[in-house]
């Protein structure tokens, strides 16, 4: 009787593992089936490491923690998937799986952008070795090498947007290689080294790495990335500039499992890179908006009624701004105190918004309504270069001290 109970218990455990699989929905290992394999793996740009396993297999159970570790460390760089062969016999048979676990690497052809025949992984079953093998398969030939001799050709050769990474590292990083796979044939990525001092100063390059996106072929109009150096943040910054984004209304094909989980350092940021901050003088404006694109919101705070309404507008702007972190800065100004800005930029009252590139002396006024859809559309159009920018001469003028309050009874 005792033996029967033990057998029943073991059978129950096997059934549970077979039903729910090794890898839960919270895992970074993506469960693959016949229904999603074609779309997820074969039709995608990303490289995939795929484990073919059986839930009762002892070696599979031993591999599981290492495979989970790989999926965490390579998140955003290489896709990590798994197929339960007890449930997906046809799919496993298609790849002639005869033992468990079997690891196969599905790489994208760097010339065609399509998947070829998978490669069997024959290395050690450790997280470090699997990761090393997977990262070595990332292509570097998607990235154009930019030097002092060809930088002008790179920037002006086409009117399409192009991203340029200014770096002092001798080799291309795995992160930038992975991004080049994500944007294969939809956004040109370049990497610049050993440029002269004059060129670096022209583009305000004061540290490495610095990532700029040039939105047309004038070689001068660019947007600077100021966010965290993670795959998900950089992807979110680059995606609106890609051809795919412009063609399908910003349809992000990389929403799932695109955040990098490993700890990274962050670039030093001004508070205005995260949310709207109030600007009260030219010095603070220069600190936040000296380079790149800056969204300037104008409010009249002279009455209590205005303040209450403006708070609602500001709350909306802070919500919308989360979609543009790393691509724009966010500031607001009380024009009841600094009353020169509205006429200086030929704006029609308040509340109002314009996007300014102070280093290039160009601005783009907002003409729509204060709504989530209208604001998002406007900011995306500015980033994509679809909105015409207006030249100006002088930076926004701030009063040296607050205007005196009117006498009140």
UniProtKB/Swiss-Prot annotation:
Residues 28-140 form the Thioredoxin domain. It is an enzyme of class 5 (isomerase). Its EC number is 5.3.4.1. A motif (Prevents secretion from ER) lies at residues 406-409. Residues 245-273 are annotated as: Disordered. Disulfide bonds join 57-60. Residues 1-21 form the signal peptide. One of its GO terms (cellular component) is endoplasmic reticulum lumen. Keywords: Disulfide bond, Endoplasmic reticulum, Isomerase, Redox-active center, Repeat, Signal. This is Putative protein disulfide-isomerase DDB_G0275025. The lineage of its organism: Eukaryota, Amoebozoa, Evosea, Eumycetozoa, Dictyostelia.
């Amino acid at each position: 009787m005792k033996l029967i109970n033990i057998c029943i218990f073991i059978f129950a455990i096997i059934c549970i593992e077979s039903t729910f699989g090794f890898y839960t929905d919270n895992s970074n290992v993506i469960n693959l089936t016949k229904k999603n394999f074609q779309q997820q793996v074969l039709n995608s740009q990303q490289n995939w490491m795929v484990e073919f396993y059986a839930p009762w297999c002892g070696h599979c159970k031993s591999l599981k923690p290492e495979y989970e570790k790989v999926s965490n460390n390579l998140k955003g760089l290489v896709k990590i998937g798994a197929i339960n062969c007890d449930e997906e016999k046809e799919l496993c048979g298609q790849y002639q799986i005869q033992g468990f676990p079997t690891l196969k690497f599905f790489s994208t052809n760097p010339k065609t952008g399509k998947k070829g025949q998978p490669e069997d992984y024959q290395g050690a079953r450790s997280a470090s070795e699997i990761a090393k093998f997977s990262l070595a398969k990332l292509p570097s030939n998607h990235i154009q090498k930019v030097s002092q001799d060809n930088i002008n050709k790179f920037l002006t050769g086409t009117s399409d947007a192009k991203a340029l990474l200014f770096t002092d590292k001798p080799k291309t990083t795995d992160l930038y290689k992975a991004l080049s796979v994500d944007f294969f044939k939809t956004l040109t990525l370049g990497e610049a080294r050993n440029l002269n001092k004059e060129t670096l100063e022209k583009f305000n390059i004061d540290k490495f790495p610095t990532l700029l996106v040039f939105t047309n072929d004038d070689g001068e109009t660019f947007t600077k990335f100021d966010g965290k150096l993670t795959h998900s943040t950089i992807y979110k910054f680059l995606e609106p500039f890609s051809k795919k984004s412009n063609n399908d209304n910003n349809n992000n094909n990389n929403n799932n499992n695109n955040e990098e989980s490993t700890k990274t350092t962050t670039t030093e940021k001004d508070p205005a890179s995260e949310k709207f901050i109030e600007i009260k003088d030219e010095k603070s404006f220069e600190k936040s908006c000296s380079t790149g694109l800056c969204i300037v919101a104008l409010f009249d705070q002279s009455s209590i009624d205005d303040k209450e309404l403006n708070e609602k507008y500001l709350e909306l702007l802070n919500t919308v701004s989360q979609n543009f972190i790393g691509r724009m800065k966010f500031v607001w100004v009380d024009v009841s105190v600094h009353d020169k800005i509205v006429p200086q930029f030929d704006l029609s009252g308040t509340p109002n918004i314009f996007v300014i590139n102070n280093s290039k002396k160009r601005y783009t006024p907002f003409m729509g309504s204060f709504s989530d859809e209208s604001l998002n559309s406007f900011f995306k159009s500015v980033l994509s270069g679809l909105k015409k920018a207006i030249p100006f001469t002088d930076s926004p003028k701030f009063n040296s001290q607050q205007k005196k309050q009117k006498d009140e009874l």
